[in-house]
A protein has these predicted regions:
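Short C-terminal tail/terminal secondary-structure segment
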Residues: 1, 223, 234-247
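Residue(s) in the substrate-gating loop at a strand-loop-helix junction
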Residues: 136
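Active-site helix of classical SDR
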Residues: 116, 154, 162
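Short, small/polar-rich loop/turn modules that mediate ligand/substrate recognition or access, typified
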Residues: 82, 170, 175, 233-235
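Conserved glycine-rich cofactor-binding loop
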Residues: 13-14
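Alpha-helical segment proximal to the catalytic Tyr-Lys
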Residues: 121, 167-168, 231
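Substrate-binding pocket helix/loop in short-chain dehydrogenase/reductase
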Residues: 92-93, 100-105, 199, 203
């Protein structure tokens, strides 16, 4: 399903990005690992058959252009993009500076928009491709115990952006979708513990399945949205959250 397909994964040096890169490599794709930490990228790339690594700060316009140009130069095409790089600025809105708010939106929303545009220009000349944006359940609902106005705004924005780009780019054969993860065991959620069955009660109480996400569950969803099995799916936001968005 993914054999030989060239797919950029941003934020690939850790967490979900690393998991997706590993899954893509296992599916026969050519994952292009992009992140700022070159040492971690190189170490991961060495473990993954067919993988490539390009150090990149996605908030830097020149780095974004270099990333796409290097992929085309090395591989001749681009089949997929996973906009995964992101961060939060947890804290009450009244204590958050506008600079902190802007930084989160720059990384979580502006950078995916700009990189998607560059990717789309490359894809439309080769018959299309697939873009998967990593949103969040917090873009669909608020969680009072985790105040983060910047993160919530950015993830709600990426959901709207996903639908708009899907509408605009379908004519080029480019599908744009998103995953909206709940709380999954990863480096980003390390403070919650490494056992998704034993996450804090305030999260489990909001999750009909009464657990966090297990390793593999989220990257399986991303691979589905990138692949031929979702060839008639675009503009969709796939919640992978144990039902949290509906409670």
């Amino acid at each position: 399903m993914h054999e030989g397909r060239v797919v950029i994964v941003t934020g690939a040096s850790s967490g979900l990005g690393e998991q997706v890169a590993v899954a893509l490599s296992g599916a026969g794709a050519v994952p292009v690992l992009a992140a700022r930490r070159a040492d971690r990228l190189d170490a991961l790339c060495a473990e993954l058959p067919g993988a490539d690594a390009i150090a990149c700060d996605v908030t830097d316009a020149a780095d974004r252009e270099r990333l796409i140009a290097t992929v085309i130069e090395r591989h001749g095409r681009l089949d997929g993009l996973v906009n995964n790089a992101g961060a939060g600025a947890t804290g009450p809105a009244l204590q958050m500076t506008t600079e902190a708010f802007a930084h989160v939106l720059d990384l979580n929303l502006t950078a995916p928009f700009a990189l998607s545009c560059l990717a789309a220009r490359a894809m439309r000349g080769t018959g299309g491709g697939a873009i998967v944006n990593v949103a969040s359940v917090m873009g669909l609902r608020s969680i009072g115990e985790i105040p983060d106005a910047a993160y919530v705004a950015s993830k709600a924005g990426i959901i709207g952006l996903t639908r708009e780009l899907a509408s605009q780019w379908g004519r080029y054969g480019i599908r744009v979708t998103a995953v909206a993860p709940g709380f999954c065991a990863s480096e980003m959620t390390a403070e919650l513990g490494d056992d998704p069955e034993a996450f804090p009660e305030f999260l489990l109480a909001r999750t009909p399945l009464r657990r966090g996400g297990r390793p593999g569950e989220l990257d399986d969803a991303v691979l589905f949205l990138l692949g031929a099995g979702s060839s008639f799916v675009t503009g969709h936001v796939l919640s992978v959250d144990g039902g949290m968005a509906v409670r």
